[in-house]
Amino acid sequence: MKYIGAHVSAAGGLDQAPARAHALEATAFALFTKNQRQWKAAPLTDDAIDAFRAACTRYGYQSQQILPHDSYLINLGHPVTEALEKSRGAFIDEMQRCADLGLTLLNFHPGSHLLQIDERDCLSRIAESINLALSQTQGVCAVIENTAGQGSNLGFRFEQLAAIIEQVEDKSRVGVCIDTCHAFAAGYDLRDEAACGETFAQFSRTVGFSYLRGMHLNDAKSAFNSRVDRHQSLGEGNIGDAAFRWIMRDPRFDGIPLILETTDPGRWQDEIAWLKAQQTAE
C-alpha cells in the first residue's frame, strides 16, 4: 500500500498536523516537531504529547506513515567543532522529541562542508553525528535525505549516502529519503520511465532499497543537473508527470511515506488524489 501525503503545518499545536493531513485525504504526512528556524524549543508537555498521539489514533495514522523533518539550522557535518556540537545537541533533542511523540522516523539533510574540510571528512562527521544520536536515543530511525548539491551540501550523490551509512554502527536505525526534485537537480534523470528505471537501478546498486524509508515527491523548477533546489507542482516542472506515475505503480515504494513538498499547498488535495489514481490507471 502506498502512503501518500504532504508536509503539513503544526501551527496551533502538533495535534493539528494529523487533522490537516486528514482534511487533505492523505494517508501519510510530514511535519516539524518544533520551529524549524530556531535552535531551541520548549520541551514537549505531557498534554501536547497526549493530544498528538490521540489525533494520530483518531485519524488513523501510524508511525510508519509519518515522516517528521528536523530543523534547517542543523549541520551534522559542520567543520567547526563548537558549531558541530551545537548541531549534534539539537539533533539529539529532535530525535528524543520524535521518540516522545511515538514517531519512529526523523528525516534530515546530511550536512555541508562549507568549503573548509574535504568531502570525506565531512561525510565521516555526519556518520559520527548519527552514531552519537543513536547511542543517546531509542526507537527512532535517522533518515538521511538526498540533496540537490546546492552550495557545499553533501548527500547529492548516492555514493555519498552509501558512505555515510557504511560508517553508521546500527544499520537498523539508519535509512534514506529520496527527494525527486533533489535527485533530478543532482543529475539523476527522471523524465521518462526508462530514466526512472536506470536511476533507481543505480540507487539499488549503490544504497539499496532496504534503506529506503520515505520519499519527497516534488517536480523541479530547476534544470536537470543544475545543483539548484527549486520545487514545483507535479507535472508542471522539468521532471514532468511520468516519474510520479512510475513510482505509484512500483511496489518497491509501498509502505513508506510519500510526501509532497510542492509549491502550492492549495493543490495538495488534488495532487494526492491524482497520485492515488495512478496506482490503478492504465
Swiss-Prot record:
InterPro entries: AP_endonuc_2, AP_endonuc_F2_Zn_BS, Xyl_isomerase-like_sf, Xyl_isomerase-like_TIM-brl
One GO term of the biological process aspect: base-excision repair
Cofactor note: Binds 3 Zn(2+) ions.
Annotated binding of Zn(2+) 2, by residue: 145, 179, 216, 261
The protein's required cofactors: Zn(2+)
Record-annotated disulphide pairs: none
Enzyme Commission code: 3.1.21.2
Residues in the signal sequence: none
Catalytic reaction list: Endonucleolytic cleavage to 5'-phosphooligonucleotide end-products
Top-rank taxon: Bacteria
UniProt entry tagged with the keyword Zinc: yes
Residues annotated for Zn(2+) 3 binding in this entry: 182, 229, 231
UniProt: Zn(2+) 1 binding residues: 69, 109, 145
Keywords noted in UniProt: DNA damage, DNA repair, Endonuclease, Hydrolase, Metal-binding, Nuclease, Zinc
Record keyword DNA damage present: yes
One function term, GO molecular function aspect: DNA binding
SUPFAM superfamilies for this protein: Xylose isomerase-like
Family to which the UniProt record says this protein belongs: Belongs to the AP endonuclease 2 family.
Function as written in the Swiss-Prot or TrEMBL entry: Endonuclease IV plays a role in DNA repair. It cleaves phosphodiester bonds at apurinic or apyrimidinic (AP) sites, generating a 3'-hydroxyl group and a 5'-terminal sugar phosphate.
HAMAP family (UniProt xref): Nfo
NCBIfam families: nfo (TIGR00587), PRK01060.1-4 (NF002199)
The protein, known as: Probable endonuclease 4
Species this chain originates from: Edwardsiella ictaluri (strain 93-146)
